[in-house]
Each structure stands twice: as C-alpha cells, then as structure tokens.
Amino acid sequence: MLNTIELAKELIKFKSTPHNLEEIHNVTKFVLDYVQKHSKTALQTKILEKNGYPTLIIATQSVKKPALTFYAHLDVVPAKNNDFTPVVKDNKLYGRGSGDMKGPAASLINAFITLVNSNPNYDICLFLPTDEESGGHNCCKHAIETFGFRTKCVIMPD
C-alpha cells in the first residue's frame, strides 16, 4: 500500500475536472483497483452513474445502508496543466486537489483499507462521488433519491 502522500500524488495527476469525464472515470477506476488490490477481504462494490458522472461505493457489507461512511469527492476545479504535477516542498504537498480534496481522499482511502483489514464487526463504506465541484446533482442526490443510499455516520474532511 502506498503511504498517504504517495497516494495523494497519484490522485493529483488525474485531471478530473468537471466535464472531463474520461479522467473522472480514470481516477474512479484507479481508486477501485487500488482498494481491491490492498484489501485482504472481499468487498461489495457499486458504481452508480448519472449523466456520465460515476459514484464509487465500496463497503464491507452493504453498499446501500452502511453504518459508517468515509466520504471524499474525486473531482477538482479546473487548473493549468502544471497544477496536476504534484510537488512536495518543505514537507508540504502542492498540486490541484491537494487540499480539496485529493489529499483528504488519500487519507480516507488508506484509512478505509486499514480498517477493513482489521476485520471490523460493523459495516463501513467508502463513498466517492465525482461531481462535487459542479453542484453534486449527478452523484450524491442520485445515490440518495434513486439508489436509496443511507448511512448512520459520515466522516467527511472537506
């Protein structure tokens, strides 16, 4: 498993801006593959999609009604191309999304994997929409209203 800074650097490289659906799908696939590779247990996965925007849901038991949800969005606001080249300077990570929200997403993804690998006796979920920067109408709203997603507790460092 990558350390959190290295994972954040990998996420920052994706130009997952609104309307760049190819990169949005690429970062979603990257995260799914990463979690599956590093989890020691079988997980339930669901990818919801509306208007081309995916929401990745990965859970230990229920992708629809988990007890604890880690939430982070994988999209970022538009930027210059060089902003997608992560740089660590003076022990700080720079790059598009390092603070909102690919840095925090990397923390939650690694925390989720670590918790999953400790065999918790409750259901936990990783909920990753891709349209937060453009209003959230295609992912969260769709997950709640159409899919029926509900959770008891959310950790969201945004």
Where are these regions (language model features)?
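Acidic/His- and Gly-rich active-site-bordering loop/insert found
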Residues: 1-96, 117-121
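Loop-rich non-cytosolic ectodomains and luminal regions
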Residues: 99
